[in-house]
Curated annotation (Swiss-Prot):
Residues 1-11 have a biased composition (Polar residues). Residues 1067-1078 have a biased composition (Basic and acidic residues). Residues 19-36, 44-53 have a biased composition (Pro residues). InterPro entries: Aminopeptidase_N-like_N, Aminopeptidase_N-like_N_sf, Peptidase_M1_dom, Peptidase_M4/M1_CTD_sf, TAF2. It comes from the Eukaryota. This is Transcription initiation factor TFIID subunit 2. Keywords: Nucleus, Transcription, Transcription regulation. It is found in: Nucleus. Component of the TFIID basal transcription factor complex, composed of TATA-box-binding protein tbp-1, and a number of TBP-associated factors (TAFs). It comes from Caenorhabditis elegans.
């Protein structure tokens, strides 16, 4: 469908809805009338001219906004022509209207990508670089030269950061003498640069599998910038400008770009079509993106201002996936009391995209891997969360953008907070609380391993004690950035809890409305500063709107890194009827922890109700006394009021008769970023699991019970698994804990069928014969969906049951094989792809190491019948999934994991070629990710793969450098950094000169994406710390900071967590969390 097809409607112009006029504001002139439907669009509006009025910047002062460049861009016109997707090239003509900020400006510094060739770099080019029509001298600068003599992080990172902080511009243009008079009078001038983009390795993705769906699109690299890869610009978030994007393309190609389509006409000379987009909201180059391809345009059926663009044949999937986009926009508009900031929203689906949605002003570039059809129910919630997060970024991220890199956490954290409100509204409080706990665990884990995260450094010139420097986008570690954004979300939520939800939303409304007002001042560029946000300006808005002073909040959680670690003990004083609490803190140097001073909330659940107290923390050791409101229990059962106000009947026979305390919780509302270890008798944890209604409390109870189960714990866990009123994540977490507890108790599985198998048969077995599962009949209601997810999780927990010898229980594999054999989806309206994948993953988890390992692998004729059956099942599933693919190839990935597990456990010969076959670019991206993850798992965790390890590692590093798909390139260093081949030390098996040289080459390769380069610096630091590798002449033990290792899931387990509800997360996560401080019982156990 061409744009002209949609222009026949009276409500549309050039395929897009007429932009709705902005809401009238007091004192503002009335909006201009919209373009008439029948009016010709061939008459383009005049080119963007320099604003005629330049007002003083002091009048529109915004705290923290500092001009980095010596000039300001007012408008930019970009024309793209001669696009050739097969040769990966196109021509770009850029015209920039800029205003000098200094009278003594003699040189213009701009950003330009390495593969964006200047006229003097193109043989035979007659193009020039001109300023107001006068030819200029220019040169390209390479700040990667002469970076480090020694091959160590300590010699590379400081030099690289200093060069980038001083001058990170690649293009230097000398201002001709003829123009200097205008510069001296600070008059706007026009710069024109013609470039040719050829085979860019980053920032642009060309997809040309076949001519029917070839396309090209932009993506952010490394994190927020990326426009420099395709045009000359100031690729900085504070350089707001008005934009005009022009595309001259073949008739079969359709562009979609930031801004509104203002013109579409045929070029008579060559038969091409000319499209012109205008972005009239001041926008930085970081938020300008586009995509070109054989897209089909579809207006959203419920909203005339939302458009989707799909590749041929994907229209039904796109329509189904984006069905609720209009409701998401309405949700955010209602919460923020503010209209959507752009006239239209365009959503384009592309192949070979990064895993995240690429967000530009009024444009979302979404990977096709997110698409699903109406028979898929497993990924709906995850996809909607990603979509609403990307829409929230249109408000905070595109309209309101950060002034500098280190303020980026503010808009993204606000967008994540808005997403959490959507999750709480649509998916429930329990899901929102579970995600909150997971974010807290991830942040504390990162800080303990790598170092403290400082959201906004108090002194931007002072280096942070980390192995890489996060103060610049091109030197920040991708793992650090990911953890920083999670910590930012937790901090933003803490702020909201302190000032209240309504005042916090008023702050966001104030920021948006001021930004929208200032964006309409097209002739006053100084006013555009209010579209920028900084830490100072945001918190000043908080104070001015709410009237609440929060200086300690800034100093404790924003300007300072680290998290608090509390070790809590308490005793009940029966004579005084009080609880005596002792709280210790640990802030040992280098472990990511910091000492907290301030209030701390404590909830004491007594037999007469729950009571909240606030105690003061003033040092490393604090003591407090809390009065109890109840006496010791007098009866066996009693109705007890909970914190939620609900009254439930509790069996009090297991508690201490002299104490009225049922359990104690510290900081239940997550008002701090912290780790907490509470030492209390096991019956407190059991009561908490059984009767507490907060998901976080139940998760904490399960973690503690798993670490130190009592004789009574097993029945409590069984009740948790069977209780259908419990949140489904608690139920399947309890199933994994039950498996762990039973595996520890040698007498647990001596006789009889495991209790989890009986529970599964009772819940999901046929009434006639419980050993045969019922036919699938998935129903999309809240309760039935939870049952469905539990049905997926129970077999995975059952598969991990082991005897004392380490062998799988004899009932497990026949049970799983029966589930696969008798699975019937013939009458079900929904797909069972994910359920079948869960069964094959369970079968893979049931495989245990062979006795003969590592001596030899048995001959095929000597394999037992059980192993033959497993091989047959996995092979059949893998082949059938190749012939008739499941959604996202989830069944094939599970079957491949099973064959890998058989190799790893010694039943099949080690053969990496099987995995490399499925990592080929011709395979779908989900299978490729699975295969590469398993290869990395073999490199890291298989001690018997020594013969293939170095070859596999070499091929993986080569793939990271040469792979076309950016999602694959970025995944490899992330997995290697999370689960390095070996830990740091002189016994490092990766300590070979070849490996060290290869890694160092990747760490200093200026051609690859900076987030990939920084990712390999994480790997390098994990292996060699800050020093040079011993194989290259470095010390055996490097001085300086080291990575503090904790128990992390292996790469294969990490892959299992890719789905938001996947129970593989519960199997793979560390459990219990670190107990290296404040838990003497655990330390003795270890």
């Amino acid at each position: 469908m061409d744009f002209s097809e949609a222009s026949t409607s009276g409500d549309r112009v050039n395929g897009f809805a007429k932009p709705f006029p902005p809401k009238p504001r007091e004192g503002a002139p009335p909006p201009a009338p919209p373009l008439a439907p029948g009016a010709s669009t061939s008459q383009a509006p005049p080119p963007l001219q320099p604003p005629p009025v330049i007002e003083s910047a002091e009048k529109f002062y915004v705290p923290g906004v500092e001009e980095k460049s010596k000039f300001r861009i007012l408008s930019q016109q970009v024309e793209i022509s001669n696009l050739n997707i097969s040769t990966r090239s196109f021509n770009v003509r850029t015209e920039i209207v800029l205003l000098p900020c200094e009278k003594s400006l003699y040189q213009l510094d701009l950003h330009i990508g390495k593969c964006s060739l200047l006229p003097n770099e193109v043989p035979g080019s007659a193009s020039k670089v001109t300023l107001n029509g006068v030819e200029c001298e220019y040169s390209r600068r390479d700040f990667w030269k002469d970076l480090a003599q020694e091959k160590s992080i300590s010699s590379l990172e400081p030099v690289l950061y200093e060069k980038l902080a001083e001058n990170d511009y690649e293009l230097q243009i000398l201002i001709p003498k003829e123009v200097r008079k205008k510069i001296k009078h600070r008059k706007a001038v026009r710069l024109r640069v013609d470039t040719v983009v050829r085979d860019p390795p980053r920032g642009l993705q060309f997809v040309d599998f076949n001519e029917h769906d070839c396309h090209v699109f932009t993506y952010h690299t490394p994190h927020i910038s990326g426009a420099r890869e395709w045009t000359v610009c100031l690729d900085e978030p504070d350089q707001l400008a008005l934009w005009e994007l022009t595309f001259e393309l073949e008739p079969h190609l359709v562009p979609v770009a930031s801004g509104e389509l203002e013109e579409k006409r045929e070029v008579s000379e060559n038969g091409k079509i000319r499209y012109k987009f205008h972005q009239t909201v001041p926008t930085s180059a970081c938020n300008i993106g586009w995509a070109i391809g054989r897209f089909k345009l579809e207006p959203h059926p419920e909203s005339p201002t939302i458009y989707t663009f799909s590749l041929p044949g994907l229209e039904p999937f796109v329509n189904h996936t984006t069905m609720y986009l209009d409701k998401m926009v309405e949700f955010l508009e209602e919460k923020l009391s503010c209209r959507f900031p752009y006239p239209t929203l365009k959503v384009v689906f592309v192949d070979q995209c990064t895993e995240e949605i690429q967000v530009y002003s009024s444009l979302l570039i979404v990977p096709t891997a997110m698409l699903y059809h109406k028979k898929i129910i497993d990924v709906v919630q995850e996809a909607r969360q990603k979509l609403i997060f990307s829409i929230a970024l249109q408000f905070f991220g595109c309209l309101i953008s950060p002034a500098q890199w280190w303020h980026w956490w503010i808009p993204v954290s606000i967008a994540r907070f808005l997403t959490s409100l959507y999750v709480e509204t649509k998916l429930g409080t329990a899901e929102a609380r579970w995600q909150l706990k997971r974010a807290m665990d991830d942040v504390c884990d990162y800080e303990h391993q790598w170092g403290k995260i400082v959201l906004s450094p108090p002194e931007p010139t002072k280096k942070l004690p980390l192995h890489v420097d996060p103060r610049h986008e091109y030197t920040a570690s991708p793992l650090y950035v990911e953890a920083m954004l999670k910590k930012g979300f937790l901090t933003m939520r803490m702020l909201q809890r302190r000032i209240g939800l309504e005042p916090f939303m008023r702050v966001l409304h104030r920021v948006l409305t001021v930004g929208l007002d200032m964006s309409e001042k097209k002739t006053t560029p100084a006013a555009w500063r209010h579209l920028l946000t900084t830490t100072e300006s945001f918190f000043r808005s908080v104070i001015s709107v709410t009237g609440k002073e929060i200086p300690s909040f800034l100093s404790q959680f924003v300007r300072t890194g680290g998290h608090a670690a509390f070790a809590v003990k308490f005793d009940f004083n029966r004579k005084r009827n009080i609880v005596e609490i002792e709280i210790k803190q640990d802030d040992t140097e280098g472990n990511g922890r910091t000492q907290y001073t301030g209030p701390l909330s404590v909830v004491v659940q007594e037999v007469d109700g729950a009571f909240t107290h606030t105690i003061q923390i003033d040092g490393a050791v604090s003591h407090a006394e809390i009065s109890c409101h109840s006496k010791g229990r007098k009866q066996r059962k009693k109705k007890v009021p909970l914190l939620t106000g609900e009254e439930i009947e509790i069996d009090l026979t297991n508690m201490d008769a002299e104490s009225p305390i049922l359990w104690l919780r510290i900081d239940p509302d997550y008002l701090l970023i912290r780790e907490i270890t509470i030492s209390q008798p096991m019956f407190h944890w059991e009561y908490m699991l059984r009767y507490e209604r907060d998901v976080i409390a139940q998760m904490e109870a399960l973690e503690r019970i798993q670490a130190l189960p009592s004789a009574h714990s097993r029945s409590v866990i069984v009740d948790a698994v069977a209780n259908e009123k419990f949140f489904y994540r608690i139920r399947y977490r309890a199933a994994f804990v039950l498996t762990f507890v039973q595996n520890r108790k040698s007498e647990a599985l001596t006789v009889g069928t495991p209790v989890l198998i009986n529970m599964f048969r009772e819940s999901f077995g046929s009434k006639a014969a419980t050993n045969i599962p019922r036919s699938n009949n998935f129903v999309v209601t809240a309760q039935n969906l939870q049952q469905y997810f539990v049905m997926q999780a129970l077999p995975q927990a059952i598969a991990r049951l082991r005897r004392q010898s380490g062998e799988c229980h004899e009932d497990v594999q026949p049970f799983l094989l029966d589930l696969i054999k008798f699975n019937d989806n013939s009458t079900n309206r929904y797909s069972d792809d994910f359920y079948r994948a869960a069964l094959y993953n369970s079968l893979a988890s049931s495989v245990f190491p062979h006795d003969a390992l590592p001596c030899h692998v048995e001959l095929p004729e000597n394999l037992s019948n059980d192993v033959r059956v497993l091989i047959k099942e996995f092979t059949y599933a893998l082949n059938m999934d190749t012939v008739s693919p499941s959604w996202g190839r989830v069944v094939g990935a599970a079957a491949l994991t099973g064959l890998y597990q058989l190799q790893k456990c010694g039943y099949l010969p080690l053969d990496s070629q099987l995995l490399w076959t499925f990592s080929h670019p011709n395979c779908c991206v989900q299978m490729r990710r699975c295969a590469i993850t398993l290869i990395i798992d073999r490199i890291v965790n298989d001690p018997h793969a020594a013969d293939t390890r170095m070859l596999d590692l070499s091929r993986i590093l080569e793939l990271a450098e040469l792979e076309q798909d950016p999602s694959i390139r970025r995944m490899i260093p992330r997995l290697l950094a999370q689960t390095p081949p070996t830990i740091f030390g002189s016994e490092n098996a990766a300590n070979t000169a070849e490996t060290a040289e290869r890694l160092w080459k990747l760490c200093t390769n200026s051609s690859i994406d900076s987030c990939i380069r920084s990712g390999f610096l994480d790997v390098y630091y994990s292996l060699y710390a800050l020093g040079a590798p011993p194989a290259l002449g470095g010390p055996e033990e490097s001085v300086g900071i080291h990575r503090a290792y904790v128990t992390v899931p292996n790469a294969a387990s990490t892959f299992a967590t890719s789905q938001w509800h996947n129970s593989g997360y519960e199997a793979a996560r560390r459990s219990p969390p670190r107990r290296d401080f404040g838990d003497e019982t655990m330390n003795l156990m270890q």
